[in-house]
């Protein structure tokens, strides 16, 4: 998918949060927090065209599973081009991830949740609920990793998670902030 299509989807779909895909610097910093030797169940919120998804799949164990939640139909079509049996594409809102994983897949807890969804598009109540639901979805010591362009959700992550880490990806355009919440 070209950046032109990404820009078109950004304009057309109010839920698309970025004009450009995550840069290498952001991806590298996000993946540093994942222990791929131990990670069995991973969830990605808002994978877009699958840039981070493909990096996750390259590093995941053979028996691990990655559930991705994407609402944009054009991006879902792109994700379907990724041929990997460990990838489960769910055309639903990440807000419902916990319920969907429990009811459809009998999964109560996961090791990691990676998110690129635009929390700035949500009101405070929805931001708080998504973070709370994410916390509840994680195993003990599980991690929630997200990158954002503002510090808007830092306090919510800090309030909910036992530990938080913040990294800047200043080489990204625009510069991004990577937040990690550890349960």
Predicted feature locations:
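Conserved beta-strand signature within the Rossmann-like core of class I S-adenosyl-L-methionine
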Residues: 140-148
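Conserved SAM/SAH-binding beta-strand->alpha-helix loop
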Residues: 72
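S-adenosyl-L-methionine
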Residues: 75-105
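Core SAM-dependent methyltransferase catalytic element
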Residues: 168-183
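Class I SAM-dependent methyltransferase Rossmann-like catalytic core
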Residues: 2-36
């Amino acid at each position: 998918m070209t950046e032109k299509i990404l820009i078109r989807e950004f304009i057309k779909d109010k839920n698309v949060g970025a004009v450009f895909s995550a840069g290498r610097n952001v991806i590298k910093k996000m993946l540093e927090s994942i222990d791929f030797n131990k990670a069995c169940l991973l969830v990605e919120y808002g994978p877009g065209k699958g840039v981070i998804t493909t990096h996750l799949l390259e590093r995941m164990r053979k028996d691990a599973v990655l559930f991705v939640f994407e609402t944009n139909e054009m991006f879902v079509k792109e994700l379907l081009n990724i041929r990997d049996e460990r990838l489960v594409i769910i055309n639903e809102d990440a807000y419902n991830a916990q319920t969907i994983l429990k009811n459809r897949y009998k999964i109560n807890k996961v090791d990691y949740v990676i998110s690129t969804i635009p929390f700035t598009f949500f009101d405070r109540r929805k931001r708080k609920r998504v973070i709370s639901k994410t916390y509840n979805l994680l195993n003990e010591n599980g991690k929630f990793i997200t990158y954002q362009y503002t510090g808007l959700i830092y306090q919510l992550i800090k309030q909910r998670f036992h530990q938080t880490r913040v990294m800047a990806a200043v080489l990204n355009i625009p510069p991004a902030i990577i937040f990690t919440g550890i349960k």
